[in-house]
C-alpha cells in the first residue's frame, strides 16, 4: 500500500557503491577474532541486542544484520553485553556508519517482570534460560553505553521496545508517564515497526555522509526536529469534532499531539494522544505526528509501507545460518528450541485487540510470503536442522489464519481509519477466504520428509467460522490433541473494551470444531485463553466468567493477568480511566473501570481458578460482599464450597488444584484445560 503520489523503490534495489560483492559471513561476527578471519579491519554497523544472537529470521537482529549485509555493509553483533561499563560496547571497535540498538524480541520490562511486577528468574532468549543478562529498559541503557564508548557515532534505536515507547507513554513498572525513549536514550533516530525499508535507507544515506538530522523524510522514523515552515498544524483536540472531516485541509499537514508535559498531568490528554496515534496508523493515509518534549518537538513520520510478497521472500531467503552463534557451545536457548522447526508465513494483524502490541508494531496490513519461499524454508529445516524428526512445529505468524487476507478494494483500504477489520463485526470489504491457506497446508504436507505440520499460532476463530473447509482441514491434519484459541472473556463489557467477538462466536467455532473432529475420528480439545483484570472488567464479570467455566467444565491451570504494555489502547484505558475507542473530550469521555489494586487483581485471578481451594476464602468473601452468597455451597450450580480442606486457603494460587470427586480432568501445561466428560 502507498499513497497515489509516493514512489517506493523495491527493498533490494540498492547496493553500497563502494562495497565489492563478498560472500556472506557464516555468522555475523561477535568478536575481533571473527572479524580478522573475515579480513575486516572494522565494522560499518554494530548491532547491540538484549537477546542471544541466533541467526534465524525469527530473531530481529538476524534479519536486520543479514539485510544490511546484503546491501554491502560489514555488520557485527554485540549480544547481551555487560552494561556496567562502556568497555564491552567497544568489543568490535568503532563502527564506521552507526550503532543499531534494540532490547530484543520482547520489551525488556515485559521480559523481566510478571504482570504483578515480580521479577522473573528466567529468560527464554538467553543461553540456558538464565535471567539477569539484560538490564531494565534495555534499549535506553545500551544506547547510553554506546554513546560513552564512541561519542560521535550515530545511534539508531529499533525493535519492539523502542517502537512501543516512541512517544510519551505510560510505564506500568514505574507507574508514571515517561518521555519518548528517544529522548531518554539520547539517540539520534528511532525506527519503529518492521524497519527493513527504513534501515536500508538510513544506512545508505549515513554512509554517503548525511547527518542523522537530515533523514527527516523517511517513513517509520522518529526524530527531534523543528516543524517546517508552511506546514499546517492540526491539533489533536479537534480531531473528534463533528465537522472534522469537512475541515480537512490539503497540503503539508502535521498533527500536534498533547505535549509530553501535558499527558503527564492530564489523563484525558493521554487518552486523546493514544486515540489519535492509533487513528493515524494506516500507511495509506497517516499524517505525521509531533509531540512537544520540553523545548523540542518529537516528530513521527507516517508508518512504513508494508512489504510486498516478493520483498517478504527476499527477507526470509537471506543466508541465515539457522542456528545460535557457535560461541554458545551446547547451551540451550529456550526461544530457539521453541521456533527452530517453525515457519513464519505472514506478518501483521487486523484484529486490533486493544491489549496486544502486534498492530502497533507490525500494522494491520497482512504481508504474506509466497508458497515457493515457504516451501523452500521447510526444505532447509528438513536438511539443516540437527535431529529433525519430520515435524514442523508451527506454520503461521501473529495469527494462524490471516494468510493473504486483505481489503477487497485498495482505495478503501488506504483511506480507512478503523482500528479493526473484524470488530464489532467483520468488515464487508474484507476478503476472508481461507483457500490460499488451505492450498498452502496441502503443499507443505507433500514435501518429502515432512511427517506432520502443526498449527500452534492462535487461530482467529471469528474468521475460521467463515470457512468450514478450513476448520475441517485444520482438524484433520494440523491439530495435535488440543488447539489453543483466545475468547479472552465471556462478558460483553470487557469484550467490547478488548475489541473481541462475543462468546457466541466461540460457541459456533466449538460446534464446528467438534463436528470436524468427530468426522475425522479424532478426540481433540479446545484450550481457551482468558484474561483477568482487563480494563472494563467488573467483579461481576469475573464471577460470570467463573460460572461459565464451571458449567463448561473448564479449569485454568495457569492464569493470564492483564499487563499494561506501553502504547497499547488498553493501557491508555488502564492509566486514564477513559475509553479512547470513543471520542475523548474533557468532561464527556466514556469512563472505564481500571483494575489497579493488587487485591482486586488477585481476586479476578482467583475467579479464573475457582476450583483451587487456596482461592476459596477470598472468593467466599467477595461473593458475600457482592450479595451472591447463594453461590457458596456444594451444588453443581454453586461456585465454591462452604467448607475448607485442611492445609489450604493460606495463599491464593500457591498450590496445585485438588482433584475432587467426579470425572478426572485431562491436564495440559496450558492456560486453559477441558475436562473429559
Swiss-Prot record:
Protein name as it appears in the record: UPF0313 protein RPA0679
Pfam families given in the database record: DUF3362, Radical_SAM, Radical_SAM_N
PANTHER family, A to Z: UPF0313 PROTEIN YGIQ
Coiled coil: none
Cleavable signal peptide: none
Cofactor(s) it depends on: [4Fe-4S] cluster
Ranges of residues in domain Radical SAM core: 335-601
Classification via InterPro entries: Elp3/MiaA/NifB-like_rSAM, Methylthiotransferase_CS, rSAM, rSAM_horseshoe, UPF0313, UPF0313_C, UPF0313_N
Keywords, alphabetical: 4Fe-4S, Iron, Iron-sulfur, Metal-binding, S-adenosyl-L-methionine
Family: Belongs to the UPF0313 family.
Organism this protein belongs to: Rhodopseudomonas palustris (strain ATCC BAA-98 / CGA009)
Organismal lineage: Bacteria, Pseudomonadati, Pseudomonadota, Alphaproteobacteria, Hyphomicrobiales
Domain of life according to the entry: Bacteria
Free-text comment on the cofactor: Binds 1 [4Fe-4S] cluster. The cluster is coordinated with 3 cysteines and an exchangeable S-adenosyl-L-methionine.
Amino acid at each position: 500500500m502507498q499513497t497515489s503520489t509516493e514512489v517506493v523503490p523495491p527493498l533490494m534495489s540498492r547496493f553500497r557503491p563502494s562495497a565489492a560483492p563478498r560472500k556472506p559471513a557464516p555468522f555475523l561476527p561477535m568478536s575481533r577474532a571473527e572479524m580478522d578471519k573475515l579480513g575486516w579491519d572494522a565494522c560499518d554497523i554494530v548491532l547491540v541486542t538484549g537477546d542471544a544472537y541466533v541467526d534465524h529470521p525469527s530473531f530481529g537482529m538476524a534479519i536486520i544484520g543479514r539485510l544490511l549485509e546484503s546491501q554491502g555493509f560489514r555488520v557485527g553483533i554485540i549480544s547481551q553485553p555487560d552494561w556496567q561499563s562502556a568497555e564491552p560496547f567497544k568489543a568490535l571497535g568503532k563502527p564506521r556508519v552507526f550503532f543499531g540498538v534494540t532490547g530484543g524480541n520482547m520489551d525488556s520490562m515485559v521480559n523481566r517482570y510478571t504482570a504483578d511486577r515480580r521479577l522473573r528468574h528466567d529468560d527464554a532468549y538467553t543461553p540456558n534460560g538464565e535471567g539477569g543478562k539484560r538490564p531494565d529498559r534495555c534499549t535506553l541503557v545500551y544506547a547510553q553505553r554506546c554513546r560513552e564508548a564512541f561519542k560521535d557515532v550515530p545511534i539508531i534505536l529499533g525493535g519492539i521496545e523502542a517502537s512501543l515507547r516512541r512517544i510519551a507513554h505510560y510505564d506500568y513498572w514505574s507507574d508514571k508517564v515517561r518521555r519518548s525513549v528517544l529522548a531518554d536514550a539520547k539517540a539520534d533516530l528511532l525506527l519503529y515497526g518492521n524497519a527493513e525499508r527504513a534501515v536500508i535507507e538510513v544506512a545508505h544515506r549515513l554512509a554517503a555522509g548525511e547527518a542523522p538530522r537530515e533523514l527527516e523524510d523517511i517513513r517509520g522514523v522518529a526524530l527531534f526536529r523543528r516543524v517546517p515552515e508552511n506546514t499546517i498544524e492540526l491539533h489533536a483536540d479537534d480531531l473528534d469534532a463533528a465537522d472534522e472531516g469537512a475541515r480537512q485541509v490539503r497540503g503539508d499537514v502535521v498533527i500536534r499531539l498533547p505535549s509530553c508535559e501535558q499527558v503527564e498531568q492530564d489523563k484525558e490528554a493521554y487518552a486523546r494522544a493514544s486515540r489519535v496515534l492509533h487513528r493515524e496508523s494506516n500507511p495509506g493515509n497517516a499524517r505525521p505526528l509531533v509531540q512537544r518534549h520540553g523545548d523540542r518537538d518529537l516528530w513521527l513520520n507516517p508508518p512504513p509501507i508494508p512489504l510486498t510478497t516478493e520483498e517478504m521472500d527476499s527477507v526470509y531467503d537471506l543466508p541465515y545460518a539457522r542456528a545460535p552463534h557457535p560461541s554458545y557451545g551446547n547451551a540451550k536457548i529456550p526461544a530457539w528450541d521453541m521456533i527452530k522447526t517453525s515457519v513464519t508465513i505472514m506478518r501483521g494483524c487486523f484484529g486490533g485487540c486493544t491489549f496486544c502490541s502486534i498492530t502497533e508494531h507490525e500494522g494491520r496490513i497482512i504481508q504474506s510470503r509466497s508458497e515457493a519461499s515457504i516451501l523452500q524454508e521447510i526444505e532447509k529445516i528438513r536438511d539443516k536442522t540437527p535431529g529433525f524428526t519430520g515435524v514442523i512445529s508451527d506454520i503461521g505468524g501473529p495469527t494462524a489464519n490471516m494468510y493473504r487476507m486483505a481489503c477487497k478494494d485498495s482505495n478503501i483500504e488506504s483511506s480507512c481509519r478503523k482500528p479493526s477489520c473484524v470488530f464489532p463485526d467483520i468488515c464487508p470489504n474484507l476478503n476472508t477466504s481461507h483457500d490460499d491457506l488451505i492450498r498452502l497446508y496441502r503443499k507443505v504436507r507433500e514435501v518429502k520428509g515432512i511427517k506432520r505440520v502443526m498449527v500452534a499460532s492462535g487461530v482467529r476463530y471469528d474468521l475460521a467460522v467463515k470457512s468450514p473447509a478450513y476448520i475441517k482441514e485444520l482438524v484433520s491434519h494440523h491439530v495435535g490433541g488440543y488447539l489453543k484459541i483466545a475468547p479472552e472473556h465471556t462478558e460483553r463489557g470487557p469484550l467490547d473494551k478488548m475489541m473481541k467477538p462475543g462468546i457466541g462466536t466461540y460457541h459456533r467455532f466449538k460446534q464446528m470444531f467438534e463436528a470436524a473432529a468427530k468426522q475425522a475420528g479424532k478426540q481433540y480439545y479446545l484450550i481457551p485463553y482468558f484474561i483477568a483484570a482487563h480494563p472494563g472488567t467488573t467483579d461481576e464479570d469475573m464471577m460470570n466468567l467463573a460460572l461459565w467455566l464451571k458449567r463448561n467444565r473448564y479449569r485454568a491451570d495457569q492464569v493470564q493477568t492483564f499487563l499494561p504494555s506501553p502504547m497499547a489502547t488498553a493501557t491508555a484505558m488502564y492509566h486514564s480511566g477513559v475509553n479512547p475507542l470513543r471520542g475523548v473530550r474533557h468532561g464527556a469521555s466514556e469512563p472505564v473501570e481500571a483494575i489497579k489494586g493488587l487485591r482486586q487483581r488477585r481476586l479476578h485471578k482467583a475467579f479464573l481458578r475457582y476450583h483451587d481451594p487456596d482461592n476459596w476464602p477470598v472468593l467466599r468473601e467477595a461473593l458475600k460482599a457482592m450479595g451472591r452468597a447463594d453461590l457458596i455451597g456444594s451444588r453443581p450450580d454453586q461456585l465454591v464450597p462452604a467448607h475448607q480442606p485442611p492445609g489450604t486457603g493460606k495463599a491464593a494460587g500457591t498450590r496445585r488444584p485438588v482433584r475432587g470427586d467426579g470425572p478426572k480432568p485431562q491436564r495440559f501445561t496450558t492456560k486453559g484445560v477441558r475436562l473429559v466428560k
